[in-house]
Amino acid sequence: MEECDYINELPDSLLTQILLDLRTKDSVKTSVSSKRWRNLWLNVPGLDLFSLQFTNPHHEEGLIKFMDRFMESNCRSRLQKFMIRYFECNGYRDRFMELIGTVVDCGIQHLYVYMHTCNRVDFIRQNIYKSKTLVSLKLYNVELKNPDFVVSLPCLKILKLMKICYGEDGPLVVEKLISGCPVLEDLELIKPFDILTQDVILFLRVSSQTLKSLRLYFATNGSVEIDAPRLKYMTFYESRFDRIMVKNMSSLFSIEIRAKSSFEYGGLLKAEDPRKRAIICDFLTVISSVRHMIISGSILEELHSYSKLGWIPQFRNLYHLQASFFGTSLQLLPTFLESCPNLKNLIMDYGAFKEENIDFHEVPQCLISTLEYVHINKLMMMEQSGIKLVNYFIENSAVLKKLTLRFSFFSSIESESYKKLLTSTKLSPTCQVIFV
């Protein structure tokens, strides 16, 4: 019985879509397969160009011919994707920029530009920011000045700006870009810089009626205002704000705060710091309808300090919590869980840098009625605070189905010794305690 060559039975249109998932250098290699495949790569509706592969100056002419040949084959039909990684060692930046303009004019849908250069390229060009076909735009290490024209990107859904340098009107540039994207759904901003001072932009306003996902990566203090009624996913990573204003968060499903301190501007919360207390209170209240939360240990440290001075709102919709508890923030655990009365899943990253004298007395409502799955990471064998923590869940969780304990160092002999230290009787008879 002859083997069937399923690949060669596929039409060219489907094969080129498959090759689109490969880097261009890999799709070119398929040309040696057979006569049919010789020029098939030229019809792939995407180009992934990695300029570091052409560091030899003598390769420049060949590279330009390669690009021209590819564009001649593809510009008659619309390209779907163009990705370029440019390194300073090459001497043909202008040719690359001309190529980018050409692919935009050809109706590109997905444009990704990564410029690894010391002198950033000015990337404000009318044909790019008035494209009627761009669906996603990702830029790295380029310069964006305030455009003297109206930005219009009617199809753009994904905008990712990484280490972008702006002029003195930096915040206005971002606002213009966002306002010119009427169907924008996914926005990511990573360390935006002022081109004159090299300082991170200190003020940012994000206003969009269509935005669903927002990720902010800031390294220094600043202010941010967010007005996005359809926002479902929000992430702050290494971001610190001395002022944060969010509104219209009724659609928010998930929030992730992975930062040293998102509210920091001069140390931990103090009683004489009413402005900071108000910022935290307003922020927590607005996000209190969230269902899924990931939060860092540094933020919990701040919340522990805040809980002594103010109130933590009820997160009544929260069913999944992933949090890092270490140091004094571990004392916040019962209080924080009390604010999550319907919590079902809890993932804890536990860190005991020193022996903490923890003594839990309160039993939150979620332990009695809803908490079914607890996963504790980074436990240490024979470390007393961790043992108390595990015993706390065992003896107080009425509906717990699975308690998973993950140790930094683990052996089967040690696990048996650890089990003997768990002296509490399981309140939930069906609970499984799993060591990994």
From Swiss-Prot:
FBD domain location: 355-407
Upper classification of the organism: Eukaryota, Viridiplantae, Streptophyta, Embryophyta, Tracheophyta
UniProt-listed PANTHER family: F-BOX/RNI SUPERFAMILY PROTEIN-RELATED, PROTEIN WITH RNI-LIKE_FBD-LIKE DOMAIN
Keyword ATP-binding attached: no
LRR repeats (start-end): 287-310, 397-420
Entries under PROSITE patterns matching the protein: FBOX
Keywords (A to Z) from UniProt: Leucine-rich repeat, Repeat
CDD domains in the cross-refs: F-box_AtFBL13-like
Name of the featured protein: Putative F-box/FBD/LRR-repeat protein At5g44960
